[in-house]
Amino acid sequence: MASMQKRLQKELLALQNDPPPGMTLNEKSVQNSITQWIVDMEGAPGTLYEGEKFQLLFKFSSRYPFDSPQVMFTGENIPVHPHVYSNGHICLSILTEDWSPALSVQSVCLSIISMLSSCKEKRRPPDNSFYVRTCNKNPKKTKWWYHDDTC
């Protein structure tokens, strides 16, 4: 078994056995391929997203964990957030330039939970319309400009 597959198996078990708060692996999503997962997410209590349900799509290349996973919101409900575009793309540095092989699916999930939980106002990024019209389907091919750490 390739090192990528071993690593994904290990992370899959960790996510099944000890998921971050409000996160659940969609078991059906991994039945056909270990390289594409859907994680169901519920907004944390006491936040602007409390009780809302979202889905995250994780896609892993053959270079994982040296290459970050492609992660985006998918489905009917995309959170309205200053770092989440209406097409589901997430502007989060650990998904691109700050990625490290020491990070994991769980650490990505925790970062997304933290990002949503710290939000003070539901709004889209200022360039949402332009970005959604002109972006690549793969958010990893975007050259992100990280202009703040808050929302």
UniProtKB/Swiss-Prot annotation:
Pfam families: UQ_con. This is Ubiquitin-conjugating enzyme E2 W. Accepts ubiquitin from the E1 complex and catalyzes its covalent attachment to other proteins. Specifically monoubiquitinates the N-terminus of various substrates, including ATXN3, MAPT/TAU, POLR2H/RPB8 and STUB1/CHIP, by recognizing backbone atoms of disordered N-termini. Involved in degradation of misfolded chaperone substrates by mediating monoubiquitination of STUB1/CHIP, leading to recruitment of ATXN3 to monoubiquitinated STUB1/CHIP, and restriction of the length of ubiquitin chain attached to STUB1/CHIP substrates by ATXN3. PANTHER family: UBIQUITIN-CONJUGATING ENZYME E2. Signal peptide: none annotated. It catalyses: S-ubiquitinyl-[E1 ubiquitin-activating enzyme]-L-cysteine + [E2 ubiquitin-conjugating enzyme]-L-cysteine = [E1 ubiquitin-activating enzyme]-L-cysteine + S-ubiquitinyl-[E2 ubiquitin-conjugating enzyme]-L-cysteine; S-ubiquitinyl-[E1 ubiquitin-activating enzyme]-L-cysteine + [acceptor protein]-N-terminal-amino acid = [E1 ubiquitin-activating enzyme]-L-cysteine + N-terminal-ubiquitinyl-[acceptor protein]. Autoubiquitinated at Met-1. InterPro entries: Ub_conjugating_enzyme, UBQ-conjugat_E2_core, UBQ-conjugating_enzyme/RWD. The gene is UBE2W. The active site is at C91. The keyword Metal-binding does not apply. Belongs to the ubiquitin-conjugating enzyme family. It comes from Homo sapiens. Keywords: ATP-binding, DNA damage, DNA repair, Nucleotide-binding, Nucleus, Transferase, Ubl conjugation, Ubl conjugation pathway. It is found in: Nucleus. GO terms for cellular component: cytoplasm; nucleoplasm; nucleus. Pathway: Protein modification; protein ubiquitination. The keyword Transferase applies. Widely expressed, with highest expression in brain, liver, pancreas and heart. GO terms for biological process: antiviral innate immune response; cellular response to misfolded protein; DNA repair; negative regulation of TORC1 signaling; proteasome-mediated ubiquitin-dependent protein catabolic process; protein K11-linked ubiquitination; protein monoubiquitination; protein polyubiquitination.
